[in-house]
Every structure is written in structure tokens, then in C-alpha cells.
């Protein structure tokens, strides 16, 4: 094989690798951004830090995301709000009773969001939403409202099927949301203040909260 043929024969391989690398960049940037947003918060995270952690230039980052705000929105959609289509489909296909559905909802939320780094987004929003009203409105529309709507559907299903007593859904949803928020805050903040023997076991905590919730909501408990 001639020297010229040797180099020519490798050109397609190099091009393919570069193309694959290019296709992977948005995901790598989102992973890096999630890490830094959770570690440092939104305000303290700089675009050049995200780019450096992803192994690209700042200019490359802005080829994919026009601003830090757009990058944050993409992180939220990738890790949380973009999954509501999947979660609502699970609601439609679920065949068990409503107590089992609520149990599935809370346990699955922990497995898919709460136990992952993405749960730090909740703490970030609680800390910084007031300073970034556009992001607060975005989070309300894409995470809070769809999440509460899904919980309302579960509780309404239970009432319609005669499994749950009549509830004020405007407030009952918070009986489900509040324990999850506490678990996230414990994971990302309060655990630092606790001894090892005081740390919450997430699975046991969720099981305990479910037991209390279902006892209070079930027709048989009234």
C-alpha cells in the first residue's frame, strides 16, 4: 500500500469519528451543565465552565444553546419535563387500583428523578427562582403544572372508582408533593447537618408516607 493510499484509506474513519463526536456534543454539554447547575446553582455557573467540563470551546456551546437560560431549559427538558409524555402513557395503561397507582407514581419518581442528580434542579429552583422570573415561569409551566396535573388525575381516578374518599384536589396534591420535596431537600442540603444514623432511607421514607397518605384517603379509613 502506498503512503498516499494509507492516508486516504483512513480519511473516512476520521470523518466518521468526528461526526459521531459532533452528534454527542449536545448530550455531553447537557450532562456537564446538569453537574454544574446542581453543584453551584444557576447564577454561579458560567458558560465557559460548562464548555470546559464537556471538553469543547465556549463558542461550540453557543452553537447549540443561544444562552445560559436556554441551556438550563434544555437540561430540565432532558431530565424531567420531557418525560411527562412517558409518565402520562403509563397512567393510561395502568390496570391496578388507585392505591397501587399512587405507590407506583411515588416510587417511580424516586427511581427516575429523585435518586438521580436531576433532583438537584428542584433545590436550585427553590433557591433561585425569585431572581430569575423567566426561568420560574418556565419551570412552573413545564414541571410543576404537568406534575400536579398527573397527581390530580391519580387522585380523581381513585375518587371516581370509589377507592378514595372525596378530596379537595387543589390541596390534596400537596400531600403527595410535599414529602417528595422534603426528600430532595434532605438529599441535597439537610443531610450535611445530620449524623449517619439520622439519615433518611428513601425507600422506607416513601413507604411510610404512602402508608399515611393511603390511610387518610381510602374509603375504608373514614
Segments from the language model and where they lie:
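Basic, helix-initiating cap at the start of DNA-binding domains
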Residues: 1-40, 44-56, 63-70, 96
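C-terminal peripheral helix-coil segments that are non-catalytic and often amphipathic
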Residues: 1-16, 100, 104-108, 145, ...
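Amphipathic, non-transmembrane alpha-helical scaffold segments
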Residues: 22, 30, 76, 136, ...
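Hydrophobic/aromatic residues within well-ordered alpha-helical segments
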Residues: 25, 68, 79-83, 98, ...
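Amphipathic alpha-helical linker/stalk segments
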Residues: 75-117, 121, 156
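Short secondary-structure transition hinges
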Residues: 111-152, 196-199
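Membrane-interface starts of transmembrane alpha-helices
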Residues: 165, 169-173
